[in-house]
Amino acid sequence: MYQDLIRNELNEAAETLANFLKDDANIHAIQRAAVLLADSFKAGGKVLSCGNGGSHCDAMHFAEELTGRYRENRPGYPAIAISDVSHISCVGNDFGFNDIFSRYVEAVGREGDVLLGISTSGNSANVIKAIAAAREKGMKVITLTGKDGGKMAGTADIEIRVPHFGYADRIQEIHIKVIHILIQLIEKEMVK
């Protein structure tokens, strides 16, 4: 009944991944991002991650696998997803939704820390404000974006972009693969 739809969905996902994989710049950006994050941890820094909707879940997943574990047991790494409901509701109510991430970065971000901003469109105003706040603090910035990078294009030290112009879920599927690879590479870098 739905077999053709299932095949089409899986084929489109495979094609999106294949297109991303063809561009060596993506491979180099992932490697550079992992080294940047590990270097920050080694120097006593931390990573803050943020995004909206599914990207918010990815930001939380990224932090959880760093503080918890990925595939093997090892020490936890300093990672915080900006996801505290009381913070988000307070700042959203008192200042506005566009400030929910930047206020947190202003409060706890330090020079030498890293911000991971995730947006499939690259146009999330609250992530863009978080990037500006991170810059004010002297933090490094890594972004996971999609399509043409949107307004976030060119704002990061390292941008990892999935140039897919269809639905956001295809971009998110690549983002989670990138997140898992970043964690794997960070773990390798941390034991060097």
UniProtKB/Swiss-Prot annotation:
> Outcome of altering R69Q?
Almost no effect
Reaction catalyzed = 2 D-sedoheptulose 7-phosphate = D-glycero-alpha-D-manno-heptose 7-phosphate + D-glycero-beta-D-manno-heptose 7-phosphate
Q: Which residues form a coiled coil?
A: none
Cellular localization per UniProt: Cytoplasm
Q: What's noted on cofactor binding?
A: Binds 1 zinc ion per subunit.
InterPro entries linked to this entry: GmhA/DiaA (IPR035461), Phosphoheptose_Isoase (IPR004515), SIS_dom (IPR001347), SIS_dom_sf (IPR046348), SIS_GmhA/DiaA_subfam (IPR050099)
Q: Sorted alphabetically, which keywords does the UniProt record give?
A: Carbohydrate metabolism, Cytoplasm, Isomerase, Lipopolysaccharide biosynthesis, Metal-binding, Zinc
Which PROSITE patterns does the UniProt entry name for this protein?
SIS
Return one Gene Ontology term, BP aspect.
D-glycero-D-manno-heptose 7-phosphate biosynthetic process
Residues that bind Zn(2+): H61, E65, Q172, H180
Task: List GO terms (cellular component aspect).
Answer: cytoplasm; cytosol; protein-containing complex
Presence of the UniProt keyword GTP-binding in the record: no
- Reported function: Catalyzes the isomerization of sedoheptulose 7-phosphate in D-glycero-D-manno-heptose 7-phosphate.
Question: Which proteins does it associate with, and in what oligomeric form?
Answer: Homotetramer.
Q: What else is noted?
A: The reaction produces a racemic mixture of D-glycero-alpha-D-manno-heptose 7-phosphate and D-glycero-beta-D-manno-heptose 7-phosphate.
Q: Which family does it belong to?
A: Belongs to the SIS family. GmhA subfamily.
Q: Which HAMAP family does the entry link to?
A: GmhA
Please report the name of this protein according to its UniProt entry.
Phosphoheptose isomerase
Q: Which organism is it from?
A: Escherichia coli (strain K12)
